[in-house]
Amino acid sequence: MNHTSNELFKAVRYALYAGTTAVVGLSAAPVLAQDDTSSQKLETITVTGSNIRRVDIETSNPVVTIDRAAIEKTGKLTLGDLVQQLPAVTGPNTNPQVNNSGGTGFSSIGLRGLGSSRTLVLINGHRYLSGDPNAIPANMIERIEVLTDGASSVYGSDAIAGVVNFILRSDYQGAEFSADYGISDRDDGASKGYSFTFGQSSDKGSIMAGVNYKKIDGVLAGHREFSKNSVSRLGSTSSPIGTFVGGSSSSPYGHIKIPAGMADLFPGCSSGFLARNPSASGLNVATDYHCYRNNATAEGPSDKYNYATVNLVMTPQERTGLFLNGNYKITDNVEAYLNVLHNKTSAAFQLAPAVFGTPYGAFISKDSYYNPFGVDFAGNTFTARLESLGNRSASSGTSNDQLSTGFKGSFSVWNDQQWNWELGFDYGHVHQSTTTYGLPNMSVLNPGMGPSFYDQTSGQVFCGTGPDDIIDGCTPFNPFNLQDPNTIAALQAAASPGVSNLFSKETVKRLDLNGGLFELPAGTMQLAVGYNYRTEYIHSNVDTGLIVDFNGNCTLGSQCGSALQGGYNVKEAYAELFVPILKDLPFVHALNLTVGDRWSKYNTFGSTNNTKFALEWRPIEDLLLRGTVSKVFRAPTIGDIFGGAASDAPKISRDPCDGYTGGGNPACVNVPTDGSFVNENVRQALQLSAIASGAAFAGFPIGPEKGKSFDFGIVYDPHWLEGLSVSADVWRVYLNENITGIGAQQVIDLCSAGQTAFCPLIRRYPSGPSQGQIQTLIEPTGNLGRVDVGGVDFALNYRLPEFSFGRFNVGLNATYLKNYDLQTAPGLEGNTTYHFAGHFENYGSAQAAACPGAGGGVCLFPRWRAQSSVGWQMGPFDASWAMRYIHRFRMGSASPSQDSHPYGTGNPSLDGLYTDYGSTVYHDIQFGYNLESLNTRFDIGVNNVGDKQPPFLYANNTLNANTDPSDFDLMGRYYWGRVTVKF
């Protein structure tokens, strides 16, 4: 595992290593052989993962550092892209490539595949409310330190998998302007950015300010070969899995269940559904409709709708930011400081036109003039695609403000021990406004699908049962012919944008002290103590047309939610003790122990204590053996507790009630007992209408998740080969009582297994043509599940001796994932263990629904992830090559008992099948030139030089771009350039 290369100012070891980090960028910082520095006093610093100030940069904490030079020499579009490519970051993470469930400009960081909620994001060691790295100006950052170990004893909640700490620049003198531009080799996805930084420093203090601007153009999925079609899998146990161009069953010409008694009109119709003939009016069942074709046949093409083309593989965003960072010495021992950050981001996502139909709140009366079938349509009997409304889209504006201010200083106590103190206040505020377009107002359309008649006198259709019963203010609506001009006009009149707002606020008041207690033979025993009081509050306003009803629907379609309001406060105190035990003995060059504890008391669930024990042993000066054992926890968030109802559209792979003949299965209430029942959502891979909610809404208790983190490593910095550092760390994280959204498949399985608390969450149609089908289902948030994840980190950095043709630096960082095991409901009937390591789990599978952070989406956990780089510098010229490696993986079969296919038992010919994918390697190159006479630097580069395309992942019409946008590059070869001028 990597270790930090922090700034030690004039320290010799840092000076020797600076050349390596400037080109390689990612460092597991070695402790290099030193010259005689006895006359120098090395300044102490605080390393991410500890509150103790020390001279040593190599401690028990495994930290990887991305320095400023690496940030400046990358052509990555966002800071989030840069951090997400670290080998320790895996699993589902949001970024601008994520369209469905993304599109806000936000990037998340999830270390160890445990999800972003278990990785804490800091700025200068303090909590960062929004957690969005993209909102931090790149010209504001000195370095990024990533701790890959549990740190709840130091930072409190969320620091389970580790910490990402953005360290800001300070004491800057001068001015700097930078401009950059990039574009793909397909002439799309253009990006441009500008930044200006100014700073002044003196003996009394410093001030630094800057502004920045970045714009990234969106890219349509139809502009990439791998994403232009929605794709499904097919195959059998005796033949390889292949693909066909599929799509959504909800087409512009309808997906209409054949009513009982009309099957004879369509003999041999295996799908059981109809679609209108494109040129027909839809008023005559026998002549205007045909059997819905799930695939192309001799009778005609597939009726499925290719929704993929208009989706995005890069969501557009535009951001403007400014920052101020200053400090002032009030006295020799007291300093005031202020850090202010403001960012405004505009972003958007785009999806195919809205799906309309009876599962989403529509009801079509048998007495409608336009209904030729003579039966009511409700339940899962009718859907269609509203192309005339245009694409569904949402634009968001996010304002992110962060302030940190206070006083800090130092004083001496007994035996001339130096102590440092800090009294501070942190404030964070986020406001996000989202406007949604392309959704129909069902409160306007539904009356028009009630009884209606054709008036012979006027030649018009009116709402009502006859001339004497005309309903005023009602416009008849024809759902069976969405291309009719009158229908289009009615739809467009019924469409209206929905506006929602979210406000969140965090305040922290803190006091920190650290310093020496007394001298021991091996060094100074040190203590760090502190106290803080933190409050968090969230409030949201949801457009009335988007407020969800009990069926998961709303008047503006199916993308529905509800208001959220809630907050909590927490009081915390910590102590950390550093004990130098032995020093300068045979086989004990140094032996140090660190013990820490943090007490946290929440007004929502109570208190928790989390401890840490860390040991550092240097048998010789060049070799460090280190180990850490920590208790970790995550408190339930405001959303976990108070989150209201929000519509969801999950898929399920099985229904235990298929073929039900009685027997009292509690999951099968209202299901017919004649053995004929087949769940249509499973059989046709249709999405359910569901409601996801916080614990309070569903009546579920919730508390913190708890666990342990282990890290044992070795770092070798041989004095006989100056510039070389190698390290390896074995790590493991156990978590119990996971805070999770309990997905639809889990709710059904647990109820069927006798866990009756989940049964009231399932609501099936009690009668009619959809009897027994799931009408709606509540997916609550609660404590359920256990995670065991472990692996090994490796790092190598080597600064070669300088040659006549320049200086070279090489680096390698890699993570091996040994195991990733998740139990869905330990100790309960219905528990399933998923083995995620080396697997990709696709949307709609029970495995993906349980994947941390995926929200029912996709999750990939390759066994190996790695980065390597080679840097060269000679005079004013420099160049670098970087490689990123993602190991081969298998889609499906995360355990022998699981099907690999989201259709589950509804498509038994595909059960147990899997697909193997090869490894993926990306190459980036960069060239730089310093024109010193003009104080100007030029950088050009190419990302993904080989134009490596992402693996084609077949996830049955529901996956973003037919691949995994969290892990793979969707843009292809990308050219970029940057000019930086210093004044």
Explain the meaning of each model-derived region:
Residues 648, 810-930, 947:
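C-terminal beta-barrel architecture of Gram-negative outer-membrane proteins
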Residues 79-82, 107-110, 158-179, 194:
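N-terminal periplasmic accessory domains that precede
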Residues 83-124:
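Extracytoplasmic beta-strand/coil segments of soluble accessory domains associated
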Residues 217-219, 223-232, 271-274, 278-318, ...:
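Surface-exposed, low-complexity loop segments enriched in small/polar and acidic residues
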Residues 119, 126-150:
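Short acidic/polar hinge/loop motifs at secondary-structure boundaries
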Residues 736, 818-819, 882-900, 928-983:
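C-terminal beta-signal and adjacent terminal beta-strands/loops
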Residues 1-86, 195, 199, 332, ...:
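N-terminal Sec signal peptide and the immediately downstream disordered periplasmic leader
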Residues 171-174, 187, 204, 331-334, ...:
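Short loop/turn motifs that connect adjacent beta-strands in outer-membrane beta-barrel proteins
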